[in-house]
């Protein structure tokens, strides 16, 4: 049975917040896709409220593309402690950190949530800009580490 990369991570040893380059996949034609773990909250100790996480997802999805080339997708983790980011190419975590922090600083100045309406979102009523700003402010003050063990 093939292993799931994220399940191989010892969640008891990591120190959030951090940005981790999980892997680089190489396709049959030499194309590369990088996958990143953007961890806001300490695993098994904290979890996003769904409305705040939903607003963070909308802001990240909408605005990360303005700050980073080659974005394929950014998706919330099922455990509600962070997001996965997939990009074309072999990206450097420093570049990812800069882009994510820029989006979060801009979120703090935002007065609305992109695509938070019935047409563009499947659960637009469960979304909180106030909650998203709280998480953004907290992670900006702590800073994302590029060392998952906090050293």
Model regions and ranges:
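His/Glu-rich zincin catalytic helix
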Residues: 1-52, 56-64
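Extended aliphatic helical segments
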Residues: 4, 14, 24, 71, ...
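Proteins with a high burden of low-complexity, intrinsically disordered sequence enriched in S/T/G/P/A and R
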Residues: 4-6, 14-17, 79-81, 95, ...
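Short, flexible coil/linker segments at or flanking structured domains
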Residues: 26, 41, 71-73, 128
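Acidic/histidine-enriched segments that form metal/cofactor-coordinating
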Residues: 86-151
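Generic recognition of cysteine residues
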Residues: 22-23, 79, 121
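Intrinsically disordered, low-complexity regions enriched in small/polar residues
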Residues: 9, 20, 27, 85-86, ...
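M16/MPP (pitrilysin/insulinase) zinc-metallopeptidase core fold and M16-derived inactive scaffolds
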Residues: 45-96
């Amino acid at each position: 049975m093939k292993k799931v990369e994220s399940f191989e991570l010892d969640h008891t040893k990591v120190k959030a917040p951090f940005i981790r380059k999980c892997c680089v996949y190489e396709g049959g034609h030499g194309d590369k896709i990088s996958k990143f773990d953007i961890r806001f909250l300490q695993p098994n100790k904290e979890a996003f409220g769904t409305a705040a996480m939903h607003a963070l997802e909308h802001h990240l999805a909408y605005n990360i593309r303005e700050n980073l080339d080659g974005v394929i997708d950014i998706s919330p983790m099922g455990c509600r402690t962070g997001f996965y980011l997939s990009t074309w190419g072999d990206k450097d975590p420093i570049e990812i950190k800069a882009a994510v922090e820029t989006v979060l600083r801009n979120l703090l100045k935002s007065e609305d949530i992109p695509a938070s309406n019935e047409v563009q979102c499947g659960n637009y009523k469960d979304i909180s800009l106030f909650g998203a700003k709280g998480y953004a402010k907290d992670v900006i003050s702590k800073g994302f580490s590029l060392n998952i063990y906090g050293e």
